[in-house]
Amino acid sequence: MNEVAIPSVLLDVPVPAATVHKQNLLDLDREGLEHFFADTLGEARYRAHQMMKWIHHRYVTDFDQMTDLGKALRAKLHQHAEVLVPNVVFDKPSTDGTHKWLLAMGTDGKNAIETVYIPDKGRGTLCVSSQVGCGLNCTFCSTATQGFNRNLTTAEIIGQVWVAARHLGNVPHQQRRLTNVVMMGMGEPLMNFDNVVRAMSVMRDDLGYGLASKRVTLSTSGLVPMIDRLATESDVSLAVSLHAANDALRESLVPLNKKYPIAELMESCARYLRGNKKRDSVTFEYTLMKGINDQPEHARQLARLMRQFDNAVQSKDAGKVNLIPFNPFPGTRYERSGETEIRAFQKILLDAQVLTMVRRTRGDDIDAACGQLKGQVMDRTRRQAEFRRTLEGQADRDAAA
């Protein structure tokens, strides 16, 4: 057998060490963490519970500060794991107490999302994003104008809650300033199903943020098959972006309606309620736009649809309506309905025994109101450039320090 001579120059080339993939623990719910500690680290599952408390109750991400974990375990964690939370590019308070954060997603300087905290009497609600951008092209939503970039990871979704809760000084089960989470930020949550459901599991876990299922709300534009899947995998509250009670008008506002028309959507919502006795209602969101969907006939159509829904579920107030005055953004052709039209619309619904609320506009002075989330600058290219400049400025400040 002939031997092959190896050039001496190759013998001097160092062989790179194998890169050990580190698991971001923020990507895991309780079950995932238990498996990671048992299977990867060879540790007892209760260690996962300690880790969840450090991350989500005490907001600690440095393993060396986790004092009830032994030195050997901390060494294994340093080798195999990390806790990466979103980087806060900037945060903006509103005059009404609303707070908006622009958060960096990833390390490439290309993706940033917004999350908003809305305080109210006796409650504090966090509006969480599920995607960078959105691909559903609803014509009245600012997020749609930037297009779809990618889904957020579980860590990036629950990381929004982590950032807000830490900023607020939230202490689960004690000093609770964050009482509700709504998946109503950027993106369509049901198009990022697995990551969203996993993140909502952490929100509701006593070792996470301890929120009751009814205090976590997922809002969808109407992906019928995924509503059915959600009914089997979660028991959170459901909200539907309806905005019109007839197919022709809804198709012009929510293009997804061409694939899943109103009749199919309403039946899937009825199945969602019938599948779990803990779920007693669906909230239907209706953005009021001047001269588009705010006329008395539109209100009467919506009232009929809600009565039909109650009958299908065989429960009074199974369908609740949340009227949302349109929040303008640069470049939109729509206008907000006047106060007179809004009250007249609500009165028709109330007279028809439909439980109806008007959402008070919050955070519009910082572009944090419903439908306004998209980033600080108008288009994706400019948004990314602004984001990179912000990070470079921070790096320069760190270097000078």
Swiss-Prot record:
Spans traversing the lipid bilayer: none
Positions of [4Fe-4S] cluster binding: C134, C138, C141
Domain (Radical SAM core) ranges: 120-365
Record text on cofactor binding: Binds 1 [4Fe-4S] cluster. The cluster is coordinated with 3 cysteines and an exchangeable S-adenosyl-L-methionine.
Cofactors (names): [4Fe-4S] cluster
Enzyme Commission number, as recorded: 2.1.1.192
Gene3D superfamilies cross-referenced by the UniProt entry: 1.10.150.530, Aldolase class I
Record-level GO BP terms: rRNA base methylation; tRNA methylation
Pfam families named in the record: Radical_SAM (PF04055), RlmN_N (PF21016)
Superkingdom as given in the UniProt entry: Bacteria
Coiled coil: none
Remarks, miscellaneous: Reaction proceeds by a ping-pong mechanism involving intermediate methylation of a conserved cysteine residue.
Protein's recorded name: Dual-specificity RNA methyltransferase RlmN
Name of the coding gene: rlmN
